[in-house]
Amino acid sequence: MLRSDDEKHISRPIVRIATIGIAVGVALMMLSVSIVKGFQKEVKGMVVGFGSHFQVVSNRDNIGRDSQRLLFSQEVYEDLKKLPDVTHVQVFASKPGIIESKQGLQGVVIKGVDADYDWKFLESVIKEGERWSPDSAETEKIIISKLIANRLQLKLNDKVSVYFVNNQDDARQKNFTIVALYETGLEDYDSQYVFTDISHVQKLSGWGIQAQMLVDTVCQNGMITAGAMAFGGDGNFRYSWSSPSWQGEGPQFIYTTKDTSFYAVVRDLAGTESDTAFATIDFYDDSSVDPCRPYKITTRTSGGSQQNYIGGYEVLINDYDKLIEADDAIFKSLPYDLQTHKVTDRSPEIFSWLAMLDINVIIIIVLMIVISIVNMTSALLIIILERQQLIGTLKALGSTDSPIVRIFLYNSAFIVGRGILWGNVVGVGIAALQWKFHFIPLNPENYYVSTVPISLEWGLFLILDLFTIGICLFAMLLPAKYVTRISPIRSIKFN
């Protein structure tokens, strides 16, 4: 009814411009949502990769880079695994440290990981080399960022000295081999984090007790001298020997004519897990009763109680949007002496910045909808003005205003729908191509990512489409009401 030769000459270009305007606006909205959501997911994924969604730590542990020791509990470990939405649980320990090279020093956070560590994130950002094997006997290996390597002029397979800083007066040194270089683009993290086996953090932090047995290789006056020493803990050691009469660290005097085994259990006043050192004296000649005849000494330890301590548990969940719910569930499952740190608690400035990006998207959406409304209002008014004679004729024949208004609203809906359809084809099409082929590059030094990130948010796309249609049609009610002001007599007479 609204199509005629007149429309082809006058209205058609206006309608086409309105359709193109709506299509461009919708395409920009789709791209804005896809890019911002993609960027947020990329950055969130990298931050989570450095420290998981949650860290379960001691109540004495503030949000920082220096873990407070925590006695590992298999029960807590298994309970965390059973919680809904939890996909992975791993232990960790971190400590401030210093990497030294010939070119200078670099302060770092040394993160120790165990065999249960989820390597997916770190493997995805390793640019040179490869991680160490979990079953490798040699663990003196370290992964650093390319940023740190460039600053200190280090390269793959170089040996570096790392100092573990326990307090102002205690820095313990250990040499490592660089086995991999990673790069994320997040300078605050790349300039800090290095990764190694958790055993080094446990040992050099002095979290547990390491007991050693000392046995004299020379027999004097028919007796063999033995003693014990220990490291770690609080330094105030107490010794419990296999022989009740032996006290302290020694020396203990052993008179024996046959093979003998003995041990010492070492504890401290702070209640640190004890460690035990063992020794065995084996005589070569069993036929003799001379206590000073040739013998062999074998000593061993239980490995040190530091292996029983961790910095905490890291918990990964299947959906970042469930962070609050999962936090409540995790906290309720923990004993009184543990607490949780969400990833948003550990890096609030990054997540505040990411949240502000949503404001940019809202501004773009509002502007595009306003432009669409202006385009449609102009187009609808021109169509109505062109159709004054038709409107007057319909009114003269007895038609009321409502059916005529509906006709123009239906026509508006058709134009808006066509614009939204083309906007979806263009916007989602470009987003899908970028998601698949990554053909638009970025400078990672400025944007943290090497290509424009895309997240295809189908639910948001549908909401945007419905919202745009609803707002535009609602806005068309005002210009469509102009129909009610058209007089049948004047419009017919005018034409």
Locate each region found by the language model.
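Short cytosolic juxtamembrane segments of multi-pass membrane proteins
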Residues: 482-495
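A structural signal for hydrophobic secondary-structure junctions
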Residues: 70, 74-220, 236, 247-249, ...
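Transmembrane alpha-helical interface segments in multi-pass membrane proteins
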Residues: 381-383, 390-435
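Hydrophobic alpha-helical transmembrane segments of multi-pass inner-membrane transport and secretion
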Residues: 12-37, 355-390, 413-422, 470-474
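Membrane-interface junction motifs in transport/secretion proteins
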Residues: 40-74
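Peri-transmembrane interface segments
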Residues: 6-16, 274, 322-371, 383-385
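Solvent-exposed segments in extracellular or luminal domains encompassing
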Residues: 250-265, 269
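Short helix-loop junctions at transmembrane helix boundaries
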Residues: 418-466, 477-485
